[in-house]
Amino acid sequence: MNIEKMTTTLQEAIAEAQKVAVTRQHQEIDIAHLWKIFLQPNHFGRNFYTDAGLDVDAFEREVDNALDEYPSVAGGNVQYGQNLSQNLFHLLQEADSLREEFQDEFLSTEIVLLALMKLKNYRLTKYLMQQGITEKELRKNIEEMRGGDRVTSQNQEEQYKALEKYGVDLVQQVKAGKQDPIIGRDEEIRDVIRILSRKTKNNPVLIGEPGVGKTAIVEGLAQRIVRKDVPENLKDKTIFSLDMGALIAGAKFRGEFEERLKAVLKEVKKSDGKIILFIDEIHNIVGAGKTEGSMDAGNLLKPMLARGELHLIGATTLDEYRQYMEKDKALERRFQKVLVKEPTVEDTISILRGLKERFEIHHGVNIHDNALVAAATLSDRYITDRFLPDKAIDLVDEASATIRVEMNSMPTELDQVTRRLMQLEIEEAALKKESDDASKKRLANLQEELADLREEANSMKMQWETEKEEVNAVSNKRAEIDKAKHELEDAENNYDLERAAVLRHGTIPQLEHELKELEEKNAKDNVKMVQESVTENEIAQVVGRLTGIPVTKLVEGEREKLMKLNETLHKRVIGQDEAVDAVSDAVIRSRAGLQDPNRPLGSFLFLGPTGVGKTELAKALAEDLFDSEDHMVRIDMSEYMEKHAVSRLVGAPPGYVGYEEGGQLTEAVRRNPYTIVLLDEIEKAHPDVFNILLQVLDDGRLTDSKGRVVDFKNTVLIMTSNIGSQLLLEGVTPEGTIPEEVENQVMNILKGHFKPEFLNRIDDTILFTPLSLDNVKGIIGKMTAQLAHRLEQQEIVLEITDEAKTWIAENGYEPAYGARPLKRFITREVETPLAKEIVSGRVMPKTKVTISLLDNQLVFENEPIEEV
């Protein structure tokens, strides 16, 4: 018997049977060893017997019994499983005769299974005949399975029932109730039906952005076929979704993938138009399985597509269609394009309403309608890099999952009581060991408190368990209704009118009445520990978590924080009232939801001399809004002085180094859409930079080098500049105000430097005034407070007299340079001498240092702090 003339599956089975013989210490490989392998899960042999109507588990037990009765041999040099038994040799000879009768080139598994029926006296054959399995019946099954084909390939078993192996029957899935309902998309489904009804080129390809519902359209068509809501020519059709991954996986040798695909196509062709093939991500067939000298999957499909023998629906995204399909013109022209557009917000709300029931049943929660509306509107506005309805469905799913997790977790109140109980029990155990009166008294009080707490914990636990049971009861009732509705659909499709009438007028109304009673009973309980409702607030929290943009309703603490934003900024930025007011007002407008949804939250141009707080205000705002001054996108425009550096903002163009990295501005905002963008020293940048900023200021959007639109609608744009600072320094009044004449002069210089279309798009141009003496004193107070804070860590208290502060202000401040020289002056005159005192040991921990003025010089006096 030539093993080379066997199919791969049979060769592998014999090799595995030898391993069984070795494990069981049997000298020969018998029929039972081989059948042990044939009956393994997912093996061709097991599936073959299952289709013949045999109880395979009982047959497997019979095979095990036969193996147990086989004699095992023990010894030092015994060779196990090296020979075939007389029975197995005889079986393979019978199988070879059958192979010649069937005119096969290779001996396949099903022929060996049939050959067993020839050995009438063998134990397993007798068992099969007792179970009603006959040679005639098995032969008929083989002929049906082969459909007139001969075995010409070593992988023949893989090609039987290829569609079942490598595809999913969508129509069957709908009948089994495994698919969510498809709402809308009627126009696209009609287009698909029309193209499928053509004589030739009857292959639609659905093209659209990821997440717009291309696969859903095919599922919608499957649902219509089940409901018989299609033209006559499609009523008896079935849709198979081809799994390209399963088709390619495990194809080890050249040509194996093509054989599998040919087997699938052969089955489709044999069905005479009854099977519609659906390939998701159809661009994968271009080049799939392509190796040197072999054809790719696309070329195997072309002849059948052209002749109309294959009904194929494809789905792919716009980018991949352009990249793969359009390159292969011959393949592209065999398809008819159906463009799937993103649904509107209104359509998305309808889709969500249709899916609501499925989500409620799956998660066991109650989803409010306002949550669905919020999911559609908020995802459309804030999640800009994905598409409806996918992103809205994700929000509802995520919010429902959050509530479900909370429902299954212990409520906070009960958790607190349980932890307190544990704490007191530990204390009780410790006090029991003490014998003094105070401890006994404390123990008595503690035991009293423990008794009360235990009672409270038990009642809360009972309430929680009851509420959970009530929620689960509602969830189970919803699932029952869903099952009954599915049964009703089945009954109507099969014209079982009596069953349909019982369900429609009896079972379903009864279940709905019971559900209503349960919901009303739940609604009466005012105080609830379990939150089971998904509202718009939960959706808003999910949006905030995904994007970092706060869209939840204002809570009390945040209201106070926003109303005090002005004061907080003033504490850090001293003297610039107009600028602080303008920025804080923009933030308040945005959180109240009143700002223009198509523009940034605010765009400001800060003008003024150096060192008066322009950049500091941006940092202060970042710290107040995001609790960290690093939480802002800071771009120093002095780095963008050359024309070619402009591309760094939006990314290098294709073909240039760094194309994959994206732009510094666009990438930062894409990852963090709610932020402050600070463009420092903007007048230093090349004029072309301002052209890039035009659409940011006007529409709140910017397209990067890869064509992705980055959303700037939730950013505060702050630009700083020193233009006209000399005029501001010279023209400021003693009171610290800027005369109108000086303001006009500065504006004229500004108009000369920036184009009108740039200035026209900025919300507010704010002039920062040079600092007055009072402002400078305030800044000195702030700087010395920071120094005092650093000294506190060394247990040194710092005090500075008003005269000393005035002297520092008069000597350290230069109007032309703003507050920055003050920092250097304080370092030189205060920090350095103080550091020397500490290092020399004259100032020790637990010391108070007072800085005062004497003979126009700062003097340091130190005294020990008395311990209280």
Swiss-Prot record:
It is found in: Cytoplasm. InterPro entries: AAA+_ATPase, ATPase_AAA_core, Chaperonin_ClpB, Clp_ATPase_C, Clp_N_dom_sf, Clp_R_dom, ClpA/B, ClpA/B_CS1. It holds the Pfam family AAA_2. Residues 3-148 form the Clp R domain. The keyword Metal-binding does not apply. The Clp repeat (R) domain probably functions as a substrate-discriminating domain, recruiting aggregated proteins to the ClpB hexamer and/or stabilizing bound proteins. The NBD2 domain is responsible for oligomerization, whereas the NBD1 domain stabilizes the hexamer probably in an ATP-dependent manner. The movement of the coiled-coil domain is essential for ClpB ability to rescue proteins from an aggregated state, probably by pulling apart large aggregated proteins, which are bound between the coiled-coils motifs of adjacent ClpB subunits in the functional hexamer. Homohexamer. The oligomerization is ATP-dependent. This is Chaperone protein ClpB. It comes from Enterococcus faecalis (strain ATCC 700802 / V583). The lineage of its organism: Bacteria, Bacillati, Bacillota, Bacilli, Lactobacillales.
